[in-house]
A protein has these predicted regions:
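Active-site-proximal helices and loops of the catalytic beta/alpha 8
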Residues: 26-29, 34-42, 75-152
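Substrate-binding/active-site clefts of carbohydrate-active enzymes
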Residues: 1-100
């Protein structure tokens, strides 16, 4: 299943854009609130309620509908504060320069651990353009836990 945890619709009527009257309840405030290329909102993975919401979403699809895996959409956008826009990614310094979103990396790692705990045969695929080292390495080996990386 294609799962989109990289961003959310800005709509306030049928989306999370202004849930309970707070436009930042699930999303980053300020300059990081909106994705500059997608006209959508960016989840704040450092908030407990966001982490619980997204992780429970993964578990729901696995438990209730018996999906056997996920292709995570827009992973590059999650990994970097710049969303990977305009970045070259030619050497390790481009990946690990303090511009990576540690909260998003934590979420992706926890999501992979959860998915593989609920269904040890589940497959996770990261749609990702930067080639982030360790993305498709097992958590036990120091990676983020994805089974595959889909280069775009």
């Amino acid at each position: 299943m294609d799962i989109v945890h990289s961003h959310a619709v800005k709509n306030e009527q049928e989306g999370l854009g202004n849930l309970a009257g707070d436009p930042n309840q699930y999303f980053y405030p300020g300059d990081r609130h909106e994705h500059p290329a997608w006209d959508s909102l960016c989840f704040d993975y450092g908030k407990d309620e966001v982490m619980h919401f997204l992780l429970s979403n993964c578990k729901y699809w696995l438990s209730e509908y018996h999906f056997d895996g996920f292709r995570f959409d827009g992973v590059t956008s999650m990994l970097y504060y710049s969303h990977g826009l305009g970045e070259a990614f030619c050497n390790y310094g481009d990946y690990f320069n303090g511009h990576e979103d540690d909260n998003a990396i934590c979420y992706l790692t926890l999501a992979n651990c959860l998915i593989h705990e609920v269904n040890k045969h589940a497959i996770t695929i990261a749609e990702e353009v930067s080639g982030m080292p360790g993305l498709a390495a097992k958590f036990a080996d120091g990676g983020y836990g994805f089974d595959y990386r889909m280069a775009m």
